[in-house]
Amino acid sequence: MKRELSGYPQRQPQRASQGSQLWNWAQNAQLAEHHQVLIPGSEERLREMVAAAPGRLRVMGSRMSPGRMLALDAPEDRLIDTGLLRGMLSHDAQSTTFAGGTPLHEVYELLTSMGRMLHASPGVIASQTLAGALATGTHGQGLAQSSIGDEVLRIRMVLADGSVQTFEREHPWFHAVQLGLGCLGIVTAVTLRTRPAAVYTCFKHAVSGDSLATDLLTWNRDYALSKAWWFPEENQVHVWTAREATDCECAQYHDNHGDPVVYQDTSDAMNNTVDRTLKQMRSDTQIRDENGKPFRTVTRFKDFSDITGDIYQVFCRGIATPQINVEIAIPLARAGAVIERIRRWHAENKPHLHYPVILRCTGASESWLSPAWQQESCFFGFVVYYAEDGSLSAEGLAFLQAVEKLLAEEGGRPHWGKYFDASLYSWSALYPQMAAFRAVREALDPQHKFSNAFSQILLG
């Protein structure tokens, strides 16, 4: 079966909408034949399918990951669709248990209706499944938390022989299961610790990039949540900083019936920068619709309206559009030096920057294979959107390849659910617990039933 193990494949929406093949969400990789997809309606049926499977198995949620994470290798292999295994299973005063196939937006909506929230900040896209978010290390922003997986209290999995095992935080293998890459078993239930829902006020600013290396630390130390977009060519930064709302702001929010309160403000500080970026993006993508999704992700940088709302209303605002997304974690203590290296490299080489550099920082993670394992980290994000015909800007891709190589040289760890060039990384050197993770895999899945070409190369 054709797949990409590295590099950046073209989109093929026409082929993906026809024929017998199942493609990933971005429509740039074939995953399986439709007849190879199994859809269990219960955990018991899933156990039967796993026990009887003649080949290897991979699990799909929303299919938003690169093809290498999900693609099957042989006719006897099967892809498990967990779409029917969703919803809230139970809850108590401090935690809630969801089925693994529950989309994150349903998790957030159910918690909000209960007056609860996760301790972890959400990622920008909420259509992925809870189990998929754990498998790939999905994270948000804020140094007081790390990935969604770090808020897990208990994980229930169907193992390779069809049996079921529950892993709690005290289990010696728990930190392997927290971020398992889909290689240890099929997650059917996840218990997440929760807290009373809070309201946040987010402030939006445009600032010079001159002091970004130090400003980044200040924003993240002084505010509960912070996110920044850096335009190196224009030496500007669009930054969001958020804190818990004051009593007065909370009252305004509740008086607005739980809808976000937007404090309308106008500023032309980013207009020229945004217009230049849009012009370049139009040239790269040849997308004719001026209101197309890629353009909306940029035009919103002209918006400086502060906002009060719950954490999901404020930060879970991604616009899902097909793209190549590369995200590399660097220890926060070294992020400033890496920013300065990127700045010097950009000034010397003047690369074609398709989209601003996204900067999100998190606290240390306990997951053995988390890019933020045991250290506060800054995730450097880079995006190139697909053109109308499914192609990618050659100059934009050249930038991605060069900047990923630079970050890999700095000891960067890539986000598992996004695109990266695996040849740049020495996994055992980057992840001191890699050998321990492999040992857990051998114990839980000695025949490597939950495997494919990519995971075999990664884990052996």
Regions found by a protein language model. Give the residues of each.
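A short glycine-rich, hydrophobically flanked beta-strand micro-motif that places a catalytic Asp/Glu
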Residues: 225-229, 323-325, 352-366, 414-419
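C-terminal structural cap/anchor segments
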Residues: 331, 337-389
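Glycine-rich N-terminal segment of FAD-binding domains in flavoprotein oxidoreductases
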Residues: 28-123, 137-142, 228
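C-terminal substrate-binding/cap subdomain adjacent to the FAD-binding core in PCMH-type
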Residues: 135, 153-337, 341-344, 348, ...
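Short, glycine/charge-rich beta-strand/loop segments that flank catalytic centers
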Residues: 62-65, 120-133, 153, 232, ...
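Short glycine/threonine-rich loop-to-helix capping motif typified by GTGT followed
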Residues: 2, 240-245, 298-302, 308-311, ...
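Activity-critical C-terminal alpha-helical subdomain
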Residues: 314, 406-460
